[in-house]
Structure formats: C-alpha cells, structure tokens
Amino acid sequence: LAEALAETRNSEHEVEFICARSECLPPVGVRTHIVGRPGGLKFIKMLWFLIRAEQVRKRGNYDLVISLGKTWNQDMMRVGGGPQKTFWELSEKAWPAGFSRWFKHLRRRLLPSNWLTRIIDNHQYRSGCRIICVSDAVRHWTQKAYPGIPVPEVIYNLPDLSRFTPPTPEQ
C-alpha cells in the first residue's frame, strides 16, 4: 500500500509508514518510522506500539492516516480478519467440547493482550473512521460484531499470480 501511494502521490504529500520493525528497505518515496518493539509479554509489545505510533501520528500532523493494525486514531482502517470477538465465536467450535474448549475459552478471557485488543477494537470500530474490509465475509462479521457503525466498504486483496507456479512433478 505504501509503495502504491508513493507511486501515485503528488508533490504536496509524502508517504510515511509507522511500524514496530522493518525487515527490508522501504520502497522509493516511502519514509519509515520504526518505533521499536520491546521484549516480553505480548501485552507490553502491543501497548508500546499503540503509544509510540500515536506519538508519531500526533507529531506528524498528517493529512490522512490509514491503519493496518492496532492503532488508536486513524482516518481509514483496513480490516483483514475481522473483530476479535467474531474470531473467538468462529474458532471456538474448532476445539473439542469439554475441558480443552473450556480452558481455551478461559485463557482467551484472562490474557491481558486480549483485553487490550478488545479495548482497541472497540475504539477503532466506533471511532467514525472509514472502514475497509478485505472481503464480504469480513464486512458481515464486522457489522455483526458492531451493529450501528457505518457500512464498511469492501476492497478485495488480489493475489499476485506471477509469484505462483504450478508444482513440478517432483514436488
């Protein structure tokens, strides 16, 4: 997304990307802000990114902020997998009935990182930002989890078929 924006930008706007870490050089025309990622519990990593990304956003005085993750304030939000509570409802059936399902349910509700995810989700979905879902199914899950929000738009992610080849007989 950052690369596409950089290719189409005009001279009035710059493309900046706020991330916890970067594993490669940014595309031409994109400036990264690496906020770091402390070790330890997932809750600490998430909270660190939430706070640091918000600090960079405020200092940046951006015209448009697009969120691809767990950020506090944004103008547009891309939803890839749907809300956490919907994921829990759908995936709970994958666990066998009985103790293992009950224990998974309990662990999900006790983990501080899941509390933080729920808080961020609730804020993001109810913030009034424009919501873009990657499929009709994700839009349905989003509307079910957050009734009353504006209807999200759907923009499908198309695969890059040039990256895939049929398997060889040896494969």
Task: Give the ranges of each region predicted by the language model.
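N-terminal subdomain of nucleotide-sugar transferases
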Residues: 1-23, 60
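Membrane-proximal helix-turn-helix segments that form the acceptor-binding/catalytic region
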Residues: 55, 104-134, 150, 154
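A short helix/loop element that forms part of the nucleotide-sugar donor recognition site in Leloir-type
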Residues: 165-171
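Residues at the starts of beta-strands that form the adenosine-phosphate
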Residues: 11-16, 75, 130, 151
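Active-site proximal beta-strand in glycosyltransferases
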Residues: 66-67, 73-104, 132, 153-154
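An amphipathic, basic-hydrophobic alpha-helix
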Residues: 39-65, 74, 114-123
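Carbohydrate-associated surface elements
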Residues: 137, 158
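Conserved nucleotide-sugar phosphate-binding/catalytic loop shared by glycosyltransferases and other
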Residues: 21-44
